[in-house]
Every structure is written in structure tokens, then in C-alpha cells.
């Protein structure tokens, strides 16, 4: 191989290497945050629809029972979520950082959120849905 080809291949490899580092450290965290925000809204909307169809359901929590009901294993066989739209690990919904999504029940409301990039609950990087909590009747 000629010296010019080796130099060109080395330069291309370095460009690809540095581009991937820049992508991983600067762009990918923003992609994770946006994708988690969309996931939280999707799960929240599905819980809202499920709660309107089954107002007697009291506790909706991050468990295999809730996941199964939303995927269509309910008395109406109605699908509220599709498996391709969610992330499940160890029978729990998880965000794009692979941390469990937080379900909080209080006074008949179900609030869901993600701990965000740093994994600490209750600070300013937590990701909440755009809609208010889901009220049970």
C-alpha cells in the first residue's frame, strides 16, 4: 500500500474516532433526556387512558402487573402500550439511563417521573410528564 493510502485511512479513522467521542459526551445525553421525556409522556397517557377505562383500579405502580395490564392483559384485552414503545428491565419500566421510573400514588393521583441524568430524585433535572397527575374516582 502506498504511504498516501495509509495516511488517508489514518486520518479518516481519527476523524471517526473524535466524532464518536464528541457525539457520546455532548449529543447523546440530550438524546437520552428527550427520549425519556417522550417515554414518560407515553406511559402517563397510557395510564390516564387505563384509569379512565378502569376507575376502580386504585394502585398503579411500576410493576409487572401494571405493565401486563397496559400491554393488553386486562378484562377488555385492550392494548394501551406496545412493547416496541417501552423499556422494561427486571419487570419495571425504566428510562433511557436504565433506572426505574418513579410511580407516586397520593390521594388517588398517580404521578410518574424519571430521576433524570444524575439519578437523584427531587432535583431540577427530574423529568415529569407534560400533563397533571392521573386522578382515580
Identify what each model region corresponds to:
Residues 2-38:
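Amphipathic alpha-helical segments typified by the pilin-like N-terminal helix
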Residues 41-137:
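Low-complexity, acidic interaction segments enriched in glycine
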Amino acid at each position: 500500500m502506498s504511504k498516501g493510502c495509509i495516511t488517508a485511512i489514518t486520518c479518516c479513522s481519527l476523524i471517526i474516532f473524535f466524532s464518536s467521542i464528541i457525539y457520546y459526551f455532548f449529543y447523546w445525553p440530550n438524546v437520552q433526556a428527550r427520549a425519556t421525556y417522550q417515554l414518560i409522556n407515553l406511559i402517563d397517557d397510557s395510564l390516564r387512558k387505563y384509569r379512565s377505562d378502569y376507575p376502580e383500579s386504585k394502585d398503579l405502580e411500576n410493576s409487572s402487573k401494571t405493565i401486563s395490564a397496559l400491554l393488553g392483559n386486562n378484562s377488555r384485552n385492550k392494548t394501551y402500550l406496545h412493547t416496541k414503545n417501552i423499556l422494561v428491565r427486571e419487570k419495571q419500566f425504566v428510562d433511557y439511563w436504565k433506572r426505574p421510573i418513579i410511580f407516586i400514588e397520593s390521594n388517588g393521583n398517580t404521578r410518574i417521573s424519571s430521576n433524570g441524568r444524575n439519578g437523584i430524585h427531587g432535583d431540577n433535572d427530574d423529568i415529569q410528564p407534560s400533563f397533571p397527575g392521573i386522578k382515580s374516582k
